[in-house]
């Protein structure tokens, strides 16, 4: 078994912003638990067309063994579109690659990575149990704060907001049709 102090995890969050936040929260907990250094490679792509720093400020509280930076070419999950080249190149550097949109859990990751010094994880799922609240870990960037304050300054009284995913997720639309949102709004 390899000492946790010599382990390095590179975590590439996938999916939309909400999924990425859950993955980052798992990565933070992985670092906080002392399993090694954790580097989150945040890619700006069609799934989430923003950089981390465009939306969020610093992660709090900061950890010495945890950082978030823009993804590099080699961090990209393998796909037909990139001819699987990043994955092939990564085999030269990483001892273990956990790819895809499968759900991983703490025990499975610890078992699989027990003899690996460098581990690559690309997922859209939470993979490390945590009780950390999103609001305690993530803070909005100055630009987002300013935009929200500007928009909400005009609100009067009590306001209820809805986020409706209408174009990108057919199963979600089946489970949460517009009529359900309308009924909930009327109850409020």
List the predicted regions and their residue ranges.
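Hydrophobic beta-strand residues in large extracellular and virion-surface proteins
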Residues: 9, 38-40, 119-121
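Secretory-pathway luminal glycosyltransferase catalytic domains
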Residues: 50-188
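Histidine-anchored nucleotide/phosphate-binding helix
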Residues: 20-32, 181-187
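A generic structural motif
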Residues: 34-39, 188
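Nucleotide-activated donor-dependent transferases that construct or modify glycoconjugates
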Residues: 2-15
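A short, glycine/small-residue-rich beta-strand->loop->alpha-helix junction that serves as a flexible
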Residues: 13-22, 171-173
């Amino acid at each position: 078994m390899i000492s946790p102090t010599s382990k390095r995890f590179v975590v590439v969050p996938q999916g939309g912003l909400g999924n990425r936040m859950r993955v980052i929260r798992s990565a933070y907990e992985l670092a906080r638990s002392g399993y090694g250094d954790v580097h989150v490679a945040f890619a700006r792509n069609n799934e989430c067309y923003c950089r981390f720093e465009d939306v969020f400020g610093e992660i709090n509280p900061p950890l010495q063994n945890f950082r978030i930076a823009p993804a590099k070419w080699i961090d990209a999950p393998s796909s037909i579109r990139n001819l699987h080249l990043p994955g092939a190149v990564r085999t030269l550097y990483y001892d273990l690659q956990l790819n895809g949109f499968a759900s991983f859990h703490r025990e499975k990751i610890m078992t699989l990575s027990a003899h690996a010094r460098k581990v690559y994880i690309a997922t859209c799922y939470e993979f490390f149990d945590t009780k950390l609240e999103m609001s305690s870990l993530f803070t909005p960037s100055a630009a987002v704060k300013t935009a929200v304050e500007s928009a909400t300054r005009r609100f009067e009284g009590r306001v209820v907001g809805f986020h409706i995913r209408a174009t990108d997720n057919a199963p979600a639309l089946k489970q949460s049709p517009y009529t359900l949102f309308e009924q909930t709004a009327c109850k409020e």
